[in-house]
Structure formats: C-alpha cells, structure tokens
C-alpha cells in the first residue's frame, strides 16, 4: 500500500511547516565551508554570537486550542459499516465525549511532526548519537514547554513520551545513549529513530528509519509498505492475527541486495505494535507482524501504534547490551525498598514520569547522582522494569516504521502521519 491511498482530511491539510520563520536554528556547516575563504576568515575573527532558538510552544501556534486532524482512512471491512441506527448514535455520542482526548492526541501528533521536520535533515554521518538524541528531545521540550521538569507544577502534564530510540543496524529497538556514550553515526549505518510525545498522558508513538547508503533503500521500502499494510488492515472487530498475516505477506515479498548478497526481508516476529493507554505506552493488546493465531479483536475508540520491523537477519530479537530504558512497573507492588536512596529515587520517578518510560539521561538532567545502585535495587524489587536493547544477529540490518492511529466509529485516523512518511 502506498501513501497515496491515504486520504488527508481537509481540516488537517498537513501543510509544510515553515520552521525557519519559527526561528529553528539551522547548523549548516557544509555551506559555511563552501563560502568565500576571505569572508569566512573575517567571520571567524568576529566574536561569535550564539543564535537563540525560537521554537514556539505549541499553544502559541494554535491559540484556539484546536489541533490538526491526522489522515483519514475508510474501514475496508464490510462489518464496520453494518451498525444499526441506535449503535451509530451511541458511537457518535462516545466520539463527542472523547473530543478532548482526541484533541490531546492530535496536539501530540502535531508536535511530533514539527519536531521531525526540524531534525530530519540535520541527522548526518559524523554526528554523535548523544547529540542527535539531545536535538530531538530539546526540540520536543521547547514545543511542549517542558524544558524544566523541576519548575513544572505537574511534570507529567505534557512533554516527552518515552526515551528517544536510536538503534543501529542489528539493534532493532530500546537503545538510547547513556551519559558518556561516544557512538558516532556512520554513512553505512541504518538507524531507527523512535520518539514520543505525550499530552495529558495521551502518547504519540511514531518512528522512521534513517540510512544514507542507497543499497538499504529496499529494506526501508519493505518496512514502510508493511507498516501501511497494517494500518490499512486495522479496524473495529478486526482480529490481530489477520493484521499480522497481511503485514508478513507484504514484508516477505521484498528482497534487498547488500554488498553483493541478496536477503529476503523478514519480519522480526517477536516484535509487535501495541495499543496505547493513558500514561502507558503498552496498553495491553499486541499487534503482531506475523500470523500468530491471536483472535483478539480491535475495538472502537482504541488507540494503537502500528509498527513493523524488517530484518536481513533471522527475524528474531534477543535482549542484550547496556540498559538505558526503564519504566515504573505496571504491577501494584506492596513491597517498598528499604534503601533510603532507592526510596528517594522512586519519589523522583513517580513525580516526574509516573508510568511513562524514562532513561538514565533524564535522571541526570534532574540532578540525580550516583543513582545506579538505587535504580537496580528498584528493578530487583519489581518496582521498576528495565528494557535492554533488542538485537537480531550481528551483521544484519533492521528497519522500522510506525504510526499512531485512532479507531473512530466510522473511519480510522492516522494521527501521526505527515508529509514525510
């Protein structure tokens, strides 16, 4: 399925974002190097003034508080159109009651689109992953007004939805740099960029893949096509296994040639899309990317992240590597830690993140020091869950694309769609 098959809502328009007029600083070193050498020398002798980024808080850009709708798609299953009049009225009433919720989701989606428009062309080989993560997250903080959690009355009201995933090559997910990481993005790398925005706990989860070497183009095309196939198949009363089957069929129809070797693109069969719940990135339902026999159905009003991962490896990931991602446990544990440091850290986590995922860098930013022992203590007590990087076999390459969708009574809304993917 292609992007052209998705019909944009007139209200959405998803128009180009003139970020230059909003004052987003563009660091284009290449152009500076190509400038006249005499003028360049003069400029270097002048005192450099740091440009101030004027990314505006999103509320200032939409003073009426109404945010653009996503791209609308019809349900293609007949049974979604067979509602009785009473049922139609009931679902319409529910949609009206959910208006504030939908608007929060759309607000997060608009921020996500603006952030990726600001950063996508600035991701180039030679950058440290740490700098890429900071660029994405600081832009998100500026749009959401969550630049200083310590100064916010409610740090969980809106801001970053989860740590920025910057997973390279055979690592498919759950990698973000910890303090001191010096990893540099290379021309031959394939990097999954997965970041989130949340407004009142309503999370936008959307991801894309960056590569520079054209030999990976077919890998990215396969995964993007598979993701849109999943979006097309999704709908009220649709069985999850049927979505996975459709995704698998499309993904496996692609081949990619890398360094003279031809590989079938395989779905990473133990990675899934998922429903999203308030302040919980994984809401309870998993959307497979292979046929798995799960007859659970999607329901009206649900909020899903449809994501697919394709690999040139075995199509199966295992956990391994230094942990960076954490989240408060979904289970209600009565046992509390005995260490004072662990108790204090838990209070910091509860106040600033609640059940939203976080990473070590976020604790660093809050001024936490020497907290790793306390954090591991919380993990051992089951109060915090750690999420190690997920890897296919070394030497393989993985790609990811993802969108957040809303299931309305009569249509689905691809709320995070932009003009880029």
Swiss-Prot record:
Gene3D superfamilies: Creatinase/methionine aminopeptidase superfamily (3.90.230.10), Winged helix-like DNA-binding domain superfamily/Winged helix DNA-binding domain (1.10.10.10). The keyword Metal-binding applies. The lineage of its organism: Eukaryota, Fungi, Dikarya, Ascomycota, Saccharomycotina. It comes from Saccharomyces cerevisiae (strain ATCC 204508 / S288c). Binds 2 divalent metal cations per subunit. Has a high-affinity and a low affinity metal-binding site. The true nature of the physiological cofactor is under debate. The enzyme is active with cobalt, zinc, manganese or divalent iron ions. Most likely, methionine aminopeptidases function as mononuclear Fe(2+)-metalloproteases under physiological conditions, and the catalytically relevant metal-binding site has been assigned to the histidine-containing high-affinity site. Also zinc has been proposed to be the physiological cofactor for yeast. Keywords: Aminopeptidase, Cytoplasm, Hydrolase, Metal-binding, Phosphoprotein, Protease. A divalent metal cation 2 binds at residues 205, 274, 307, 402. Present with 1080 molecules/cell in log phase SD medium. Transmembrane segments: none annotated. This is Methionine aminopeptidase 2.
């Amino acid at each position: 399925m292609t992007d052209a098959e998705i019909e944009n809502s007139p209200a959405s328009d998803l128009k180009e974002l003139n970020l230059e007029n909003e004052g987003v600083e563009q660091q284009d070193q290449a152009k500076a190097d190509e400038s006249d050498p005499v003028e360049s020398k003069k400029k270097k002798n002048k005192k450099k003034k740091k440009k101030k980024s004027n990314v505006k808080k999103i509320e200032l850009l939409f003073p009426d508080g109404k945010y653009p709708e996503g791209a609308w798609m019809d349900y293609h299953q007949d049974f979604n159109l067979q509602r009785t009049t009473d049922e139609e009225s009931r679902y319409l009433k529910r949609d009206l009651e959910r208006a504030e919720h939908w608007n929060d989701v759309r607000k997060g989606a608009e921020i996500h689109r603006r952030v990726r428009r600001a950063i996508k062309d600035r991701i180039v080989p030679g950058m440290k992953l740490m700098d890429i993560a900071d660029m994405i997250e600081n832009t998100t903080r500026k749009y959401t007004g969550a630049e200083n959690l310590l100064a916010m009355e409610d740090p969980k009201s809106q801001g970053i939805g989860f740590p920025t995933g910057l997973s390279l090559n055979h690592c498919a997910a759950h990698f973000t740099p910890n303090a001191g990481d010096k990893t540099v993005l290379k021309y031959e790398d394939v990097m999954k960029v997965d970041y989130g925005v949340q407004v009142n706990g309503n999370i936008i989860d959307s991801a894309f893949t960056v590569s520079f070497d054209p030999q990976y183009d077919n890998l990215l095309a396969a995964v993007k096509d598979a993701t849109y196939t999943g979006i097309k198949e999704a709908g009220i009363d649709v069985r999850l296994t049927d979505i996975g089957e459709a995704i698998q069929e499309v993904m496996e129809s692609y081949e990619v040639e890398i360094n003279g070797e031809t590989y079938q693109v395989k779905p990473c069969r133990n990675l899934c899309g998922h429903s999203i719940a308030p302040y919980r990135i994984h809401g309870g339902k998993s959307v497979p990317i292979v046929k798995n026999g799960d007859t659970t159905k999607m329901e009206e009003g649900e909020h899903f992240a449809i994501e697919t991962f394709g690999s040139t490896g075995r199509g199966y990931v295992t956990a391994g590597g230094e942990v960076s991602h954490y989240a408060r446990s979904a289970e209600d544990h009565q046992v509390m830690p005995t260490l004072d440091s662990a108790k204090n850290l838990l209070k910091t986590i509860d106040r600033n993140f609640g059940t939203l995922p976080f990473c070590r860098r976020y604790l660093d930013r809050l001024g936490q020091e020497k907290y790793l022992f306390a954090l591991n203590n919380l993990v051992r007590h089951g109060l915090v869950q750690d999420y190690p990087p997920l890897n296919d076999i070394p030497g393989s390459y993985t790609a990811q694309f993802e969108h957040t969708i809303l299931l309305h009574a009569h249509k689905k809304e691809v709320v995070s769609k932009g003009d880029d993917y």
